[in-house]
């Protein structure tokens, strides 16, 4: 939702011809990885405060889960994020954040044309998909998982499987079944 809001505000100011008069400061629990930050900057964010990451790092430092002081650990995290953003910018030949901000150099995958036209004006998309309704359903699902009923407190958090296959996690094309089929085909020389 933060990327939708950022881009929508960015384009609203552009339509009013007032974009250069305002900064868009993001304070959100969503951004965690360089890609998240890159998208937010690419769609108009001027600055980003990933408060939840900072709170988690501070908590882990105070509980001795990590060895650095909170300040040092947050500084290390910020350096890693900056390095990741610079890497993204370098791959497309942009050398300053000023040039990257609002450049919208991404292609959208899996979002409906209607959603793109409303929130991500002029962003190319060749593979259409979900709209605002499906995004709302996903947000509500995640919210209800995050704020579980008291009777379920103490149960472990779900692993998720965003990046690799997990039982009962996000669906992936590469999963144990496809790997087994591939291995069988290779063994049988098919």
Q: What residue spans do the PLM features occupy?
A:
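Active-site-adjacent beta->alpha loops and helix N-cap segments on the catalytic face
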Residues: 2-8, 56-66
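Hydrophobic faces of well-ordered beta-strands that scaffold small-molecule active sites
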Residues: 22-28, 41, 48-50, 98
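Catalytic cores of alpha/beta
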Residues: 31-44
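Conserved, mostly hydrophobic/aromatic
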Residues: 9, 40, 96
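Active-site-proximal loop/turn and secondary-structure-junction residues that shape catalytic pockets
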Residues: 28-32, 54
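Flexible, glycine-rich loop/tail regions that form catalytic "lids" or insertion modules at the edges
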Residues: 36-37, 47-50, 62-190
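Alpha-helix-loop-beta-strand connector modules within alpha/beta enzyme cores
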Residues: 2-26, 76-83, 87
């Amino acid at each position: 939702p933060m990327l939708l809001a950022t881009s929508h505000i960015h384009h609203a100011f552009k339509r009013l011809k007032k974009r250069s008069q305002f900064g868009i400061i993001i304070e959100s629990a969503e951004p965690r990885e360089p890609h998240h930050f890159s998208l937010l900057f690419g769609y108009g964010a001027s600055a980003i405060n990933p408060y939840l990451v900072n709170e988690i790092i501070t908590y882990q430092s105070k509980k001795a889960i990590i060895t650095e002081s909170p300040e040092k650990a947050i500084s290390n995290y910020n350096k890693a994020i900056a390095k990741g953003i610079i890497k993204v910018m370098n791959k497309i030949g942009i050398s300053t954040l000023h040039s990257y901000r609002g450049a919208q150099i991404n292609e959208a995958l899996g979002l409906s044309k209607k959603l793109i036209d409303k929130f991500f004006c002029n962003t190319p998309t060749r593979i259409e998909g979900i709209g605002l309704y499906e995004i709302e359903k996903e947000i509500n699902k995640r919210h209800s998982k995050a704020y579980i009923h008291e009777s379920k407190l103490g149960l472990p958090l779900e692993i998720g499987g965003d990046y690799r296959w997990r039982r009962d996690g996000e669906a992936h094309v590469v999963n144990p079944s496809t790997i087994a089929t591939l291995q069988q085909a290779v063994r049988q020389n098919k």
